[in-house]
From Swiss-Prot:
Its cofactor is adenosylcob(III)alamin. The gene is glmS. GO terms for molecular function: cobalamin binding; metal ion binding; methylaspartate mutase activity. Adenosylcob(III)alamin binds at residues 13-17, 61-63, 93-97. It comes from the Bacteria. Its EC number is 5.4.99.1. Catalyzes the carbon skeleton rearrangement of L-glutamate to L-threo-3-methylaspartate ((2S,3S)-3-methylaspartate). Transmembrane segments: none annotated. It catalyses: (2S,3S)-3-methyl-L-aspartate = L-glutamate. It comes from Clostridium tetani (strain Massachusetts / E88). Pathway: Amino-acid degradation; L-glutamate degradation via mesaconate pathway; acetate and pyruvate from L-glutamate: step 1/4. GO terms for biological process: anaerobic glutamate catabolic process; glutamate catabolic process via L-citramalate. This is Glutamate mutase sigma subunit.
Length: 137
């Protein structure tokens, strides 16, 4: 079976590179073709990389607490760019302060994200979810 391609990056003005490298290594080891666009990435970079590589999913990371601002509108931009239905995952420290997680998760799902991960979620959880969502046995 052909490897599934994912675009991975850290959105907005966030420069947290260590978690990005861990995710890159973990998803690569799990058999995915990872296109890592790095840190400080605007939404357009995720979209352009997904189009260029015919990606199956976009994985957005944010650790500096501003993810809610940075992630708003990405689903709509994906749809406008012809990426309707592409899987969108987001995770990390995606909001400012301690907030009730079910509320945070709902807000991101309402923005069009398929999966939303709390701080400290192990990469293996996202890998298992992605395999399920892409029907990989």
């Amino acid at each position: 079976m052909e490897k599934k391609t994912i675009v991975l990056g850290v959105i907005g003005s966030d420069c947290h590179a260590v978690g990005n490298k861990i995710l890159d290594h973990s998803f690569t080891a799990a058999g995915f073709n990872v296109v890592n666009i790095g840190v400080l990435s605007p939404q357009e970079d995720f979209i352009n990389a997904a189009i260029e590589t015919k990606a199956d999913a976009i994985l957005v990371s944010s650790l500096y607490g501003q993810g809610e601002i940075d992630c708003k509108g990405l689903r709509q931009k994906c749809d406008e760019a012809g990426l309707e239905g592409i899987l969108l995952y987001v995770g990390g420290n995606i909001v400012v302060g301690k907030q009730h997680w079910p509320d945070v998760e709902k807000r991101f799902k309402d923005m069009g994200y398929d999966r939303v991960y709390a701080p400290g979620t192990p990469p293996e959880v996202g890998i298992a979810d992605l395999k399920e969502d892409l029907n990989i046995k």
